[in-house]
From Swiss-Prot:
GO terms for biological process: lysine biosynthetic process via diaminopimelate. Its EC number is 2.6.1.83. It comes from Desulfovibrio desulfuricans (strain ATCC 27774 / DSM 6949 / MB). It catalyses: (2S,6S)-2,6-diaminopimelate + 2-oxoglutarate = (S)-2,3,4,5-tetrahydrodipicolinate + L-glutamate + H2O + H(+). This is LL-diaminopimelate aminotransferase. CDD domains: AAT_like.
Length: 408
């Protein structure tokens, strides 16, 4: 009989959002006449912008024309998309990249989960706490976690992000090899100032670490002094990989397109006396394990950068931002301590003192038909909080606020 990779047996039996879905399904089955409003999983609700739909239609028609048909594309992404990414996401912010430092994919989640494959198995990983579960689980699968004790892994370094430090992590006491940072943050909705991000870049340069920087929510930044890219910080190209997504920016959660930036200046030890390029290694990995994002999807992503596309997605994002502002204001008026929601689509809500995260989740679901995400599902430091998302419709957001008020 074949033998399992035992690291997979260390994983919790269920993924956080699968647990939530199971509870919600049970509630709906028991209460078929009650309409449930979800402020839980961070999926968008607005349809794709018309400019994107038009580009999709055109690309589909091309695939039906023998003279225009495209088969396998470049694993790294088509030049037409990499060029506009380089121009509109980076050059306009004073960041210089080469097209071959951009790798287009079918999602930031697989890229974030897979990039750790390039590092030695005994590499030390640091994550913020609370944390997006993929950062931890992918390293558990890779055999880097050690053993679980008191809900934390023995070989993973946790960096608490709590009220007392304004949700900005302190530098780790133990030097890690890989540092996962996500800003604007999921789940807390908080951000790093330019000075704070510069501090992390300087730390990584000093200690020889690599920052894996997830900026999937950068389009929601409203404050001028908050960096949109880690490469706005001098020297970051030598210590950081950046993950970007079209999912929340342009509603691509069901279409799937993202990209990862791996600067050619970024090198790590070869385990001997030399160093190797992470750009070259990621390119090699992708050529072996990935056949590229579909042509029609990349044409749709290209349309996001058109003048019409930018206008349309900015309108959609503005709607989600209004939802976040409504949730923040209403929750504050109800007496909740509220964080995030200014530069991100997430609200981090402190639950009443007499309950815990899952208890408050159950109360909202059972008494108000509302779905949130329990903070404890993101780590120890998330206990006592829940995450609310602003991705609903304005009408559902207003109704959710009304239901929440009825409990207070």
């Amino acid at each position: 009989m074949a033998t399992v990779n035992s690291n997979f047996l260390k994983l919790q039996s269920n993924y956080l959002f699968a647990d939530i879905a199971r509870k919600v399904t049970a509630f709906k089955n028991a209460n078929p006449d009650r309409r449930v409003i979800s402020l839980g999983i961070g999926d968008v609700t607005r349809p794709l912008p018309p400019a994107v739909i038009q580009a999709l239609h055109k690309a589909v028609d091309e695939m039906g024309d023998a003279t225009l048909f495209r088969g396998y594309g470049p694993e790294q992404g088509y030049a037409f998309l990499r060029d506009v990414i380089m121009q509109y996401d980076y050059k306009v912010r004073g960041v210089t990249l080469a097209p071959d430092e951009i790798f287009v994919s079918d999602g930031a989640k697989p890229d974030v989960g897979n990039f750790q494959e390039l590092f030695a198995q005994d590499s030390i990983v640091a994550v913020t706490d609370p944390v997006y579960p993929v950062y931890v689980d992918s390293n558990v699968m890779a055999g880097r976690s050690g053993e679980i004790k008191d809900s934390q892994w023995s070989r993973i370094v946790y960096l608490p992000c709590i009220k007392e430090n304004d949700f900005v992590p302190d530098f780790p006491a133990v030097r890690p090899d890989m540092i996962y940072l996500c800003y604007p943050n999921n789940p807390t909705g908080t951000v790093l100032s330019r000075a704070a991000l510069q501090g992390w870049v300087e730390y990584a340069r000093r200690e020889g670490c690599v920052i894996l920087y997830d900026s999937a929510y950068e389009a929601f930044i409203t404050e001028a002094d908050i960096p949109h890219s880690i490469y706005e910080i001098d020297g970051a190209e030598e210590v950081a990989v950046e993950f970007r997504s079209f999912s929340k920016t342009a509603g691509f959660t069901g279409l799937r397109c993202a990209y990862t930036v791996v600067p050619k200046a970024l090198r790590i030890s070869d385990g001997k006396s030399g160093s190797v390029s992470l750009n070259a290694l990621w390119n090699r990995r992708q050529c072996t394990k990935y056949n590229g994002c579909p042509y029609i999807v990349q044409r749709a992503a290209e349309a996001v950068y058109s003048e019409r596309g930018q206008s349309e997605i900015m309108g959609i994002i503005a709607g989600y931002q209004r939802n976040a502002a409504m949730l923040r204001t209403a929750a504050s008026e109800m007496g909740f301590a509220v964080y995030g929601g200014v530069n991100a689509p997430y609200i981090w809500l402190r639950v009443p003192d007499n309950t815990d995260s899952w208890g408050f989740f159950d109360r909202l679901l059972q008494q108000a038909g509302l779905v949130c995400t329990p903070g404890a599902g993101f780590g120890i430091s998330g206990e006592g909080y829940v995450r609310l998302t602003a991705f609903g419709s304005p009408e559902d957001t207003e109704e959710a606020i009304h239901r929440l008020r009825s409990l207070c």
